[in-house]
UniProtKB/Swiss-Prot annotation:
Species annotation: Raoultella planticola (Klebsiella planticola)
Entry protein name: Chaperonin GroEL
Role played: Together with its co-chaperonin GroES, plays an essential role in assisting protein folding. The GroEL-GroES system forms a nano-cage that allows encapsulation of the non-native substrate proteins and provides a physical environment optimized to promote and accelerate protein folding.
Enzyme Commission no: 5.6.1.7
Gene name of the record: groEL
Location of this chain's protein in the cell: Cytoplasm
Family label: Belongs to the chaperonin (HSP60) family.
Gene Ontology biological process terms in this record: protein refolding
Signal peptide: none
SUPFAM superfamilies (alphabetical): GroEL apical domain-like, GroEL equatorial domain-like, GroEL-intermediate domain like
Catalytic reactions of this protein: ATP + H2O + a folded polypeptide = ADP + phosphate + an unfolded polypeptide
A Pfam family reported for this protein in Swiss-Prot or TrEMBL: Cpn60_TCP1
HAMAP family: CH60
Gene Ontology molecular functions: ATP binding; ATP-dependent protein folding chaperone; isomerase activity
Length: 540
């Protein structure tokens, strides 16, 4: 086992604080509308330019192992805030740095670290409750656009684009961000349910100019099995041909004789048919087939529940107003399923989302809800160069997370004002002893740090602005973009409550642990291997 290097008490804490400061100083230059960029060197390709706090934090590794431990713990604050709310990473880092710096001063002055931590925790718990009372719901398109604009570093076009996307697909809809091909940002909205499976044979194409299959008012056959024998299909095909409507087959697979016969029938114009594979794999495929059945008012023909394909009738088939299939995707528009059945299915999936343990499962379930209840919007980010594209895409993703958080828990005044108002409301809070009171003061002082940093990045004097804002009340604050005072909500400077809350909670959590650190252990650096000299040969 490698030898260890151990540091105790103040020696350990000083090293740790140095690491915290290196990381936090690099991150906090990006805060606010006049925050600066950070350039990150990459081992290959062009450097990345970013104003995203967590992207900067993730790049930082320090040579000194004790300092690096401090930096990595603050990196955890940024990552956790990013995972919880998708934004607020820089605010969380600034808060953590302030709590750690002030807290360690108090420890050096002889305060009890555990009582300091209890005081900090008490102040943060009270602050979170106050934030909830300050929060106002964010429901209209204008407020959503303002939140998106602030989070995308004051880029109004991004805010408007996200508001438009949310307007079109609803609060439950899925919005994804992709690289665009032009210079302008574009919004692409997919109506109905779309899944990533294209036609099984190009001979099904009936719109050669677009290379797509379009079926008007088709019947939809859903089968949880491979279809290779055409005899199983004959009763359904005959019934559909009599009804004079097209047929879409969604099955695990359609192959061999069955596929060949369907192609021949389509080409001769006997019956208009298209076949696609069912989306997903394993249990997820079964669930998605059931979603499509609910949406189209059909039944999944599954041998697991004793149903046979030969015995299926038109009553078992789903229907939709229109289906469009290209080589990669199938879109079902306006299924005829009952609204109550669709809502029941959505409620059931939401329940599964609450019980899901992994982020991947949760994301996939959320997509299924969107396909049933809302729709899917794709924001295509346009830029002149690849470097700009990466930077802009990261900002759009941040803004998207922020608007989702705003819809979820509401918004508070931005620009660090909400935390200042919260701090003034809980200023009279008292702990059980004097050391806890110092902990409370440390937390209250830290709540001013985001506003101070925003002002500092503007080139103004933080203390003057902070005192002016404190002398006002309600949403009165400082608009750093225009350098004027006023009502932050009226000026459209909003922060999602969830982002502010998460930043404060995670910063206090990690900072509290660091203040109570008494010993640090790391591996000793390995020395160079001893030189063994040249091996002696056999004399000849």
């Amino acid at each position: 086992m490698a030898a260890k290097d151990v540091k105790f008490g103040n020696d350990a804490r000083v090293k740790m604080l140095r690491g915290v400061n290196v990381l936090a100083d690099a991150v906090k230059v990006t805060l606010g509308p006049k925050g600066r960029n950070v350039v990150l060197d990459k081992s290959f390709g062009a450097p990345t330019i970013t104003k995203d706090g967590v992207s900067v934090a993730r790049e930082i590794e320090l040579e000194d192992k004790f300092e690096n431990m401090g930096a990595q713990m603050v990196k955890e604050v940024a990552s956790k805030a990013n995972d919880a709310a998708g934004d607020g990473t820089t605010t969380a880092t600034v808060l953590a740095q302030s709590i750690i710096t002030e807290g360690l001063k108090a420890v050096a002055a002889g305060m009890n670290p555990m009582d300091l931590k209890r005081g900090i925790d008490k102040a943060v718990a009270a602050a979170v409750e106050e934030l909830k009372t300050l929060s106002v719901p964010c429901s209209d398109s204008k407020a959503i656009a303002q939140v998106g604009t602030i989070s995308a570093n004051s880029d109004e076009t991004v805010g408007k684009l996200i508001a438009e996307a949310m307007d079109k697909v609803g609060k439950e809809g899925v919005i994804t961000v992709e690289d665009g091909t032009g210079l302008q940002d574009e919004l692409d909205v997919v109506e109905g349910m779309q899944f990533d499976r294209g036609y099984l044979s190009p001979y099904f194409i009936n719109k050669p100019e677009t290379g797509a299959v379009e079926l008007e008012s088709p019947f939809i056959l859903l089968a949880d099995k491979k279809i290779s024998n055409i005899r199983e299909m004959l009763p359904v095909l005959e019934a559909v041909a009599k009804a004079g409507k097209p047929l879409l087959i969604i099955a695990e697979d359609v192959e061999g004789e069955a596929l060949a016969t369907l192609v021949v029938n389509t080409m001769r114009g006997i019956v208009k048919v298209a076949a696609v594979k069912a989306p997903g794999f394993g249990d997820r495929r079964k669930a998605m087939l059931q979603d499509i059945a609910t949406l189209t008012g059909g039944t999944v023909i599954s041998e697991e529940i004793g149903m046979e394909l030969e015995k299926s009738t038109l009553e078992d088939l789903g229907q939709a107003k229109r289906v469009v299939i290209n080589k990669d995707t199938t879109t079902i528009i306006d299924g005829v399923g009952e609204e109550s059945a669709i809502q029941g299915r959505v409620t059931q999936i939401r329940q599964q989302i609450e019980e899901a343990t992994s982020d991947y499962d949760r994301e996939k379930l959320q997509e299924r809800v969107a396909k049933l209840a809302g729709g899917v919007a794709v924001i295509k980010v346009g830029a002149a160069t690849e470097v700009e594209m990466k930077e802009k895409k990261a900002r759009v993703e941040d803004a998207l997370h922020a608007t989702r958080a705003a819809v979820e828990e509401g918004v508070v005044a931005g620009g660090g004002v909400a935390l200042i108002r919260v701090a003034s409301k809980i200023a009279e809070l008292k702990g059980q002893n004097e050391d806890q009171n110092v902990g409370i003061k440390v937390a209250l002082r830290a709540m001013e740090s985001p506003l101070r940093q925003i002002v500092l990045n503007c080139g103004e004097e933080p203390s003057v602005v902070a005192n002016t804002v404190k002398s006002g009340d309600g949403n009165y604050g400082y608009n750093a973009a225009t350098e004027e005072y006023g009502n932050m909500i009226d000026m459209g400077i909003l922060d999602p409550t969830k982002v502010t809350r998460s930043a404060l909670q995670y910063a206090a959590s990690v900072a509290g642990l660091m203040i109570t650190t008494e010993c640090m252990v790391t591996d000793l650096p390995k020395g160079d291997a001893p030189d063994l000299g040249a091996a002696g040969g056999m004399g000849g």
